[in-house]
Amino acid sequence: MLYEKFEYNINNLIGNFGLSKISIAVSGGSDSVALLYLANIWAEKNNIELFVISVDHNLREQSKQETHYIQNISNSLNRKHYSLSFYHQNNFSNLQERAREGRYDLMTNLCLELDILVLLTAHHEDDYVENFCLRLERNSGIFGLSSSNINWYNNIQIIRPLYNIPKSKLVEYLVRHNIKWFEDESNSSDKYRRNVIRQKLAKGADYIRHFSKPVYREEFKGDTERSTAAYTLVREDASTGTASKLSLEAKCGKMSKAAIISQQLKTNKLIENEFKPELISAIAEAVKIFEYGFAFLDLVKFDKFSNEVKVQIINFLLIIISGQSRVARFYSVEPILKLITQDVNFKNTLHGCIIKRIQNELLIYREFGKKLPESKILLDKSVIWDNRFCITKNQETPNCFVTHLSLKDYKIIKKQLDLEPLKNLSCKNHNAVLLTLPIIKILEKVIAIPHISYYDNDMWNFEVSFSPNFVSRFTHFC
């Protein structure tokens, strides 16, 4: 039965956390409505408080009805419901991605306020299949093709207990129990490639890949044991132990839903057993991240790891140092990897960072000047600035705000600054790093630069920590 499978999944995913409360994302579609009823049964059995969260993206007239419907269901189940709104501000550029990020920002921030550690979402088996196909068409590597049933966002654990349950079973459950749900009209539009894939697979047809990009990444030819995920999986299945470029295209060009699920499981197994442990080892061995918001990569140690892991390490550092949430595309990272192999010093910019080779190390620090971080007023006790630093005031300091150091301000206070520790740690790149650090000002006057212990008055006391909101499916550090 459906509930028994759900119960087995969620108990395995959550483990022995001893949770007293949990949250669930519900939109009004069949997937999330079914999840709500299943989770409600499980929560009652385990004496767990269930909080229901809906997000209105203000894009469809029907969304208001959906939110109201979920509120009514929540009330009937005696569960607390929270309705949140995402405002696109009439900016429709890359809207789907921005809406997704906005939705998760809203939901996880609410979880933090409510002291909830886990958020359930209704990603089911068909979603995983569609994602695999879309990533295959983007020529993703093995990390990109893999999937996970547990993710992290804003230090909230995102759990997907429907991962091995097809949508048809969820719909059957709702019909059997006479439960209403809403259909999003955009899901039937051929405008989105995901919908085309979904409709074909729903009819039992094979998935036929669109070859809009090269199938085989040439730079991985030398990695004889492991290369891109598709290539690796073909090698595993081939009786001869080898696979030509032609056979790769044939294998990935046409696949049934069952074959896609099989490939997905093999990919996940390879990630979990080999690549993920290697990535964690690589970060531990080759990476040093400093409280000043810059990092060094040991290129001698870096060289021993596989190409796919190297890409992940560079992206890991770019996200951490830039404060951005999106990873850089492979075609952007590739030139950096090629430069590293040439064994010459260089200086490049990428993803809001400066990447500078200094002999056998790679220094990565925040690019300054292209897009300056916004100033933040210190109204509360603490504030996050530049998506990277948490600044806390330990006394009442009226009218102060956090910003960056301008060249004008630097010239005024230059002689009062002790930059020797920063100079030594950054291999004499202290001036560039200094301009990326948070400073506290009152009106036009710099009153504190906590990183270098500069205060214009002994009464000031601020704490600062490097706390980037890092999001990854493969590593998580609170």
Swiss-Prot record:
UniProt xrefs under HAMAP family: tRNA_Ile_lys_synt (MF_01161)
Record-linked Gene3D superfamilies: HUPs
UniProt GO cellular component terms: cytoplasm
Cross-referenced NCBIfam families: lysidine_TilS_N, RPE1
UniProt record, GO biological process: tRNA modification
Superkingdom of the source species: Bacteria
Main location: cytoplasm
Keywords: ATP-binding, Cytoplasm, Ligase, Nucleotide-binding, tRNA processing
Coiled coil: none
Protein name per UniProt: tRNA(Ile)-lysidine synthase
Residues that hold ATP according to the record: S27, G28, G29, S30, D31, S32
Top-tier EC class: ligase
Localization in the cell: Cytoplasm
Pfam families the record matches: ATP_bind_3 (PF01171)
EC number(s) on file: 6.3.4.19
One Gene Ontology molecular-function label: ATP binding
Catalyzed reactions per annotation: cytidine(34) in tRNA(Ile2) + L-lysine + ATP = lysidine(34) in tRNA(Ile2) + AMP + diphosphate + H(+)
Domain description: The N-terminal region contains the highly conserved SGGXDS motif, predicted to be a P-loop motif involved in ATP binding.
Role of this protein: Ligates lysine onto the cytidine present at position 34 of the AUA codon-specific tRNA(Ile) that contains the anticodon CAU, in an ATP-dependent manner. Cytidine is converted to lysidine, thus changing the amino acid specificity of the tRNA from methionine to isoleucine.
InterPro entries: Rossmann-like_a/b/a_fold (IPR014729), RPE1 (IPR005728), TilS/TtcA_N (IPR011063), tRNA_Ile_lys_synt (IPR012094), tRNA_Ile_lys_synt_N (IPR012795)
The family this protein is said to belong to: Belongs to the tRNA(Ile)-lysidine synthase family.
